[in-house]
Amino acid sequence: MQRLKDWTVEDLNEEQKKVHDEIVNGPRGRVVGPLRIWLNNPKLARVAQQVGAYARYGTSLDNSLSELAIITTGRVWSSKFEWEHHAPLAIKAGIKEEYVNTIAQAKRPIFDNQIEQIVFDFAAESNILKNVKDDTFAIAIEKLGQTRVIDIVGICGYYSLISMTLNVFKVPNDTLDWPLPEINDFSNMLK
């Protein structure tokens, strides 16, 4: 059960309505999940949704790599809502379903594509270790460049905020199409 009472547009004050309208008129087109929680604090909602619009739609990464970083973060946080929204998007963007299923099991896929492997390893380490190993950082900088590495950190950080919000406030999933197993040990995701 969600920990905060949900709201309707009629419940919102003027500042909340402004932020609500910014979100609805932006790339998302709707207010769902963590945004519904954040809108209780419209100042946070405004800033977070702006960062989120960049993290989701504006980074230097291809969509498939962004979605890979997102689902890796969501998996480590055991965020079922996040997983169910982004696992299908990762596949649609070009990440093989077998890799997505391996990540769902909290295991490290061995990608055919070196860049996907680098992004996965970087995202997994940053979320699990709260840092990345020197060799992971070096190869990421060499193959991706600093802008894309910074964007991976931004995506992982933003989706950690999302996942924490979803978990802490017990935001329910709107679907149960892709169950996420309960796993507490993520060491098998590390190289």
Tell me the role of every PLM-derived stretch.
Residues 1-191:
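Hydrophobic alpha-helical segments
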